[in-house]
Amino acid sequence: MSNIKSSFIQTVSFFAALFLIGLTACVDNPKSKNRDVKPRSADPGWVLLFDGETLDGWVVTNFVLPGTGEVVDGAIQLEMGDGCTGVTWGDDFPKMEYEVKLEAKKLSGNDFFCGITFPVGDSFCSLIVGGWGGPVVGLSNIDGYDASENETSSLKKFEPDSWYTIHLKVSSDKIEAWIDGEQVINLDTRGKQLSIRSDVAPSKPFGICSWRTSSTLRNIRLKK
């Protein structure tokens, strides 16, 4: 009888141990959180600039009166400030013949949720998405005129809490951009004077910011 009792206790202990091991494996930890929002593997020819876990390679941009910039749920979250809030790439970045893709989402606010400042040769320009009250898309600046006033300006409705895929392409004589596959910019840059507004100058050479708006960014990748 004692042998049967001992065997029974050993069996119960064995299954209890298995249960505890399984329970431990299910406990959340930082590396297993939010698996559904981790960056996808970059397509051939593309390099991921954001790992979905840290700001490695990035610095929070030194704007005046910014909100916070940090990684939340596998994305870079830019909290609303009293001006621009953003991140700037801190490593080498091409000046010409490259493409950038990313996904951006507006969380709250009424101005641009994604402003990409980028090099074009020795000049710089910014792609503004959702500016001037929310609908304006365009390049700032072209021949001294910002995105609301120059030939690249267009209007597009952006829903809050919705992801938009933004694709920027810079070549020797053209700047192009697409949002969710729809081309919104097709500018022949020959003979054009490209510049940026002074308030986004800290984003140089390559940075992404919002203006008095909370937004989030993910799957930032580069092709050159």
PLM region spans:
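Carbohydrate-interacting regions of secretory-pathway proteins
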Residues: 26-224
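Bacterial N-terminal signal peptides that target proteins for export
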Residues: 2-15
